[in-house]
């Protein structure tokens, strides 16, 4: 999800397979999904060293945990992945008495957890966000001054998408998210795998396929370098793109919009594998991370909203006061939660997605 940057030299990347020689926490998370000093400060405070293995994909995470013996003490699964892992018996049920900040979780996320009844007892929310439209304000307005930037019409109507093909359109490489957004746009069940629903979504997507330049989950570099002007993807893409452009001295402005037609919401979590060797270190890390000042630092660095209500006042106002990054209660209620669907439905959706991606 995030671009890999350098971490403190005292931190070791990659999973070590030898015997423990000291107090070591082994965690598995997306690249750059902490503040720059989070792990170093944890080690300085607790004396627990950290081995940070970078997650390639949710599918790899799931495969590692399903086979047991992963070697990790703490993992960071998405909402539906955590649900499947808990149903498979791959996660520990957490002891609330050992967690200091469960009551600090944002009320909206507390309600969102109700959609994941199996994993709620085994996870602590970490960060969250939505899927929406990140765009280069100048390039979009130059081509269409009255562009409906808060509408999926911008992407799903061929006559509009065609106007931005020359400056570059990308879609997140996620069948679950894109198909859910497309089906909801059509007024259909977002997580459906019915043939008639997938056919309707495929028809919608195929009409704009000629104008899609890339399928990728990390569009920041291409946005900043001018290879893209419109991207359907994570809400954090805008914050990261703007920060990167500002650091490079590029006079470009990016915006992010939650589509008025509705979109999906996702939540990443902290969880302890059932076979973790050092669950006590995992609890220590969760409690450290959930302190308001630490969660705010993580949010400010990653560009994603924090799960901690107490941390929100310390979040960068550019994020905190942006209603498309931190939607109000009414907008949040319209977001579509994930759903743990059967394998047969996942395969049907993947077939539709693959056909769309490979079409010319």
Placement of each model-derived feature along the sequence:
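Bacterial N-terminal signal peptides
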Residues: 2-12
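Early extracytoplasmic/lumenal segment of secretory-pathway proteins
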Residues: 19-85
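Paired acidic/hydrophobic, glycine-rich loop segments that form the ligand-binding mouth/hinge
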Residues: 72-77, 212-213, 229-234
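Extracytoplasmic ligand-binding site segments that recognize negatively charged/polar headgroups
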Residues: 76, 82-213, 218-220, 224
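A ligand-binding cleft/hinge motif common to bilobed small-molecule-binding domains
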Residues: 81-84, 230-251
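Extracytoplasmic/periplasmic substrate-recognition and gating elements
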Residues: 221, 246-301, 359-360
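Mature extracytoplasmic/periplasmic domains
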Residues: 273-334, 338
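Conserved C-terminal helix/tail region of periplasmic/extracytoplasmic solute-binding proteins
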Residues: 329-360
């Amino acid at each position: 999800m995030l671009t890999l940057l350098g971490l403190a030299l005292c931190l070791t990347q990659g999973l070590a397979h030898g015997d423990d020689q000291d107090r070591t926490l082994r965690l598995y998370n997306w690249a750059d999904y902490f503040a720059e000093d989070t792990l170093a400060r944890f080690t300085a405070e607790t004396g627990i060293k950290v081995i940070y293995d970078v997650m390639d994909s949710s599918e790899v995470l799931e495969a590692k945990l399903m086979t047991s013996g992963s070697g990790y003490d703490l993992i960071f699964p998405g909402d539906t992945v955590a649900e499947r892992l808990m149903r498979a018996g791959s996660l520990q049920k957490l002891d609330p008495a050992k967690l200091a900040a469960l009551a600090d979780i944002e009320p909206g996320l507390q309600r969102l957890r109700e959609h994941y009844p199996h994993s709620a007892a085994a996870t602590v929310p970490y960060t969250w966000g939505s899927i929406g439209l990140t765009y280069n304000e100048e390039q979009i307005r130059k081509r269409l001054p009255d562009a409906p930037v808060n509408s999926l019409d911008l992407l799903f109507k061929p006559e509009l998408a065609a106007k931005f093909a020359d400056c570059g359109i990308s879609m997140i490489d996620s069948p679950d998210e894109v198909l859910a957004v497309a089906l909801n746009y059509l007024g259909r069940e977002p997580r459906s795998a019915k043939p008639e629903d997938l056919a309707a979504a495929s028809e919608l997507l195929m009409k704009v396929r000629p104008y899609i330049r890339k399928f990728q989950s990390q569009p920041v570099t291409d946005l900043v370098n001018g290879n893209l002007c419109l991207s359907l993807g994570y809400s954090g893409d805008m914050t990261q793109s703007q920060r990167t452009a500002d650091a490079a001295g590029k006079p470009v402005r990016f915006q992010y919009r939650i589509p008025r037609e509705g979109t999906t919401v996702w939540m990443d979590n902290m969880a302890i594998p059932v076979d973790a060797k050092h669950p006590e270190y995992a609890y220590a890390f969760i409690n450290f991370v959930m302190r308001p000042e630490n969660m705010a630092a993580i949010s400010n660095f990653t560009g994603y909203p924090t799960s901690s209500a107490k941390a929100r006042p310390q979040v960068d106002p550019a994020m905190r006061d942006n209603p498309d990054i931190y939607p109000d209660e009414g907008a949040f209620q319209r977001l579509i939660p994930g759903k743990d669907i059967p394998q047969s439905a996942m395969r049907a959706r993947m077939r539709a997605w693959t056909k769309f991606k490979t079409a010319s």
